Amino acid sequence: MSSYLFTSESVSEGHPDKIADQISDAVLDAILAQDKRARVACETMVKTGVAIVAGEVTTSAWIDLEALTRKVILDIGYNSSDVGFDGETCGVLNLIGKQSPDINQGVDRKNPEQQGAGDQGLMFGYATNETDSFMPAAIHLSHRLVEQQAKIRKKKNSALSWLRPDAKSQVTLRYEDGVATAIDAVVLSTQHDPGVKQKDLIEAVREEILKPVLPAKWLHKGTKFHINPTGKFVIGGPVGDCGLTGRKIIVDTYGGWARHGGGAFSGKDPSKVDRSAAYAARYVAKNVVAAGLADRCEVQVSYAIGVAEPTSISVTTFGTGKIADEQIEKLIRKHFDLRPFGIIQMLDLIHPMYQQTASYGHFGRKPKDFTYTDGTGAQHSATSFSWEKTDRADALRAAAKLK
């Protein structure tokens, strides 16, 4: 019997890198609400007292970048210099310019179906049936822990009102013959007000954050809990560390369990295959697993700049496939249009929804219907996390002729 440990981590919405991701995606959302043809590549850096927003944008829209940036920071919970960062008073520097026409000529086409990829690159999507979210268990639990920290922190009349926005989690699982059987270690570090006793913090975190999230069946007397192991975490957020867009790509995806092509997501409109094709690859892999074609599935796609058709599509099921990987690949090519325009249409990606993705993972979330207001004041219905739907599983299963 083989036995091994595997670890994944996550960070909260108040982590400096996640502040940057959320600002970049808030800018993207605000522009897409007014201009569906916009091209956006927005990068953010946050450090003590300042947020720098830079990048390349081609759009007819106008947004109040300073007000938008401040709102994101304040909504996260950085509203006082006492906390270490204040959205009301921090500086906001706008360094956004226009996108290169050399890129535009490679992407835009008279026939939208022939829209070229915005850049070359390779992307991976992954799914597993070890959790209800079709995500690896370690990253799933890590996300839920920091999400719970934020929920408790923002709760009205919270008993843990001394919690601050910055937090990190880490979960180590023990696997026996490829099956998760126990939690070996948990790390939860949370920023807090000064004067909080370590004993009180540990007890509160155990009861209010860890217990509601961690499955009791995986906890045992040997499980190690490391709660604020340095003893104090008062200085956090952009004061403690400089934050940058796109620096948490493993947190954003599969926690290291699956491979990664290297491209970040936040601040990029759907013409950038770094983002849209990674979402599509997850959609494909999840439907393959939901169809029962495999217990685990990893899909790789790759592109050349200005070219519509993927340069490759490959599938790996790690020996768990109910049919050959080559057959699954043929089914994918038949049932999914993985050209850039095909992905955008298939997943309905051109509308505001991206700030929601910028914390607690881009994958393993539930599709959510919502409405938004465009630049004319008109209301529109849309769905976020559409790539998490399993609406093609039945067709795949039927085509594979599985009983």
From Swiss-Prot:
Amino acids binding K(+): 43
| EC number(s) on file | 2.5.1.6
List, alphabetically, the SUPFAM superfamilies matched: S-adenosylmethionine synthetase
- Provide the catalytic activity annotation: L-methionine + ATP + H2O = S-adenosyl-L-methionine + phosphate + diphosphate
InterPro entries to which the protein is assigned, alphabetical: ADOMET_SYNTHASE_CS, S-AdoMet_synt_C, S-AdoMet_synt_central, S-AdoMet_synt_N, S-AdoMet_synthetase, S-AdoMet_synthetase_sfam
Cited Pfam families: S-AdoMet_synt_C, S-AdoMet_synt_M, S-AdoMet_synt_N
Q: Which residues form the signal peptide?
A: none
Q: Which positions bind ATP?
A: 15, 166-168, 232-233, 241, 247-248, 264, 268
**Which GO MF terms does the UniProt record name?**
ATP binding; magnesium ion binding; methionine adenosyltransferase activity
List the protein's name. Answer: S-adenosylmethionine synthase
Gene, per the UniProt record: metK
